[in-house]
Amino acid sequence: MGMASGVFELNYGGKTLNLKEIKDYRLIEYGDLALMGEAGRPFLPVDNVLIAISSDQEPLGIEILKIEAETLRSVMPPPAPPPAPLVKKPDPFPEPDPLVYGGTGPYPSRLVEIAGTGHLFGQKVALLRVNVGRYLPAERSVVLLKALRFRLKSRKARDDGSRCRNADFVRKVVLNPEDVRVFAKNGDLEYVVITSESLSDEFEPLVRWKRQKGIRAEIRTVEWISSNYSGRDLQEKIRNYLKSAADSGLVWVLLGGDVSVVPHRIAFAMNSGANIFSDEDSIPCDLYYSDLDGTWDYNNNGVFGEVGDSVDLLPDVIVGRAPVETGSEASLFVDKVLHYEVESPEGYLNRALFAGEYLDWETDGGLAKDFVVGELPDGVQVCKLYERFNNLDAASFIDSINSGFNLVNHNGHGSIQVLCTGPDAIYPEDFQDLSNYPRLVGLFYSIGCWTAAFDYEDCMAEFFVLAQEGGGFYVGNSRYGWYTQYFPGYGSSDIFDRRFFGFLKSSTHRAGVALALVKAFMAPASRAENDFRWNEYTLTYFGDPEMPLYFADPESLRLEVAGNLNSGLVDIPVVLEAGEAPVPAGLAGLSDGQELLTSGYSDEAGFVLLHADLTGLDSVLLVGSKPGLRPVSRWVSVMEGPYVAVDTFYVSDENGDGYLAPGEAGTLHLSVVNEGNSDLYSLVAYLAPTDSLISVSDTDFAVGDLPQGATAGAEFPVVASQDLRDGVPTRLVLRLVSSLVR
């Protein structure tokens, strides 16, 4: 099954079903699924599904092959209330639509709907909505989907030339991760800071750290971009630059400045109907710099992001913003990023502070927070300040942050310079006076209205990020947040919130990645003028997009280098470990302290082989990193003289397949080369196992003399243990001993 056959399966059987009585209705809570419905129509579980398809494939329809479902009899779901901005006064409980509740056919009429297609990090995807719950009004029953097998029917279309650029991210969202393939080659740039010439020096330490870690990073000034790229304004020029850079391997984008430095794009999702601010429907939207398909103004009317503008809402790069205007603010932001990643103290990183107030007299934000608690990584301890518990107010909230919390989640009202805390509120001076340093908040997430309105002079998010002695990093709304009256946890802002933390746990522990993935996941629900589309535009991340978050006190990485480093072209064997275990998928970077020389990711045994030219260098810096572990740095001296590296190796075994099976004997053949600048004499190779999975019966082999540039072989009899298994790494240590003279 998969892309080749077009046949796919969904399974909901493991989800917990909860029927909750509300008025004369039964609310159907089904695992982590969202509840959706048009106003007055049944409020039912819905799933969003993304399917990776080929670039020359165009979906036509859905063929249902098999359905497993449960019928919930004598169950009438409540009518959905209209979505409401968090400033709206509560309406009466919604009246049911008589055309649906008095009808005869199922609602919704279709089990699966195709919402469109788009490109996620270059991968073409089909966007589907699955109506997991369907109401049968004539029987007063709900049919609840348990499993589904279907075919995505499609036709051959013109190849649009799209190619996946980041399979790891795409695979976390699509139904068929096995069909995702990376076609694009890595370029010379993975991370970029876009800032002004006047602020570029302040961002240099951050870029230097990225290079030291092994990430190809640069600074691009808005002045340089404006002079070298076309566009109707600076925003479009920046976006056109990002388009070309994304095609060459760009992943991470830090917008290094407030709107006076890196201008924002205003997007239109819909009319909110709040009628409070004249610019309330003009959403400052950094998704414009992340979703790089099209122009966002297809009809060329100067209004960006309209449904008719063919915005696919799927990110192509990961974006964060540093809301800084001065050199001192930029330095403060950079210092906080470096401090959090490298020096965060222990004792608070597994602590989360959840605040929930009554959004109205019928809607308890604390209940919405309880849904999010279930999405947190194991071991995270949650402190709940809920208006329902009578323990939420401004003083307790600020005191708690100052005591040290890594994650903060706020479900409450807000405005440009207000963040509400039940009976009272927090104001700019409260954030400015925070004193939680060195225990910076890795992530503060709020669904409150306007707290991240970064197009205004200063908003609450900016005060938090730029607090001199504390604060941290922030995700919030640049305009209204949205809720569903009477149904806490099921408003669109709640749904984004919950899914965000789910992706944060399952992705690369990066807030920027989680925000990109939740926007991709919600795209099938956001293709119309609705509050889901609004959330796509309004949610903004103030932080470094590549910075990983901790969820516990981190173990420190250990970095081992086999042998000495010699001048010239050399292979450098590096092993990454934590505790007593190897670290797979860790990044090892080699630099001269300023410029990146080479980098690579470790295999299952924690091993990575770096190849670099060390000519003219006295020492190099090795850095090992992996999200969730504390990075390690080590300066290593570069020596003149011989340098022996393993060139090739293979196994000749009893059955001739080149793989050692459990209990099988064979010979390990090694080829070594002298890549240094002098000769070696009387070289002897010693091979030793590090565990019982492989035994070596004759552990030394006399290689002989090895002149500069020469290659020689060595052979070792080996036997595999009966305990050897596929996917279980084992390590052999090769030691080479020689003389520099005859």
Predicted regions and their residues:
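Extracellular Ig-like/FN3 beta-sandwich strand-entry sites
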Residues: T615-S619, A665, R725-R731
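Intrinsically disordered, low-complexity Pro/Gly/Ser/Thr-rich segments with frequent PxxP/GP/PP motifs
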Residues: S599-L609, S695-L724
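Terminal connector regions
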Residues: G624-E640, V719-R742
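Low-complexity, acidic Ser/Thr/Pro/Gly-rich terminal tails and inter-domain linkers that flank the onset
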Residues: P554-V561, M639-P662
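Short, solvent-exposed loop/turn segments enriched in Ser/Thr/Gly
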Residues: G568-D571, P662-H669, A712-A714, V728-T730
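Short acidic/proline- and small/hydrophobic-mixed sequence motifs that coincide with surface turns
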Residues: P582-P584, N677-L683
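Cysteine-dependent hydrolase recognition
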Residues: M1-W635
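Asparagine-centered strand-capping/turn motif at beta-strand->loop junctions
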Residues: V672-G676
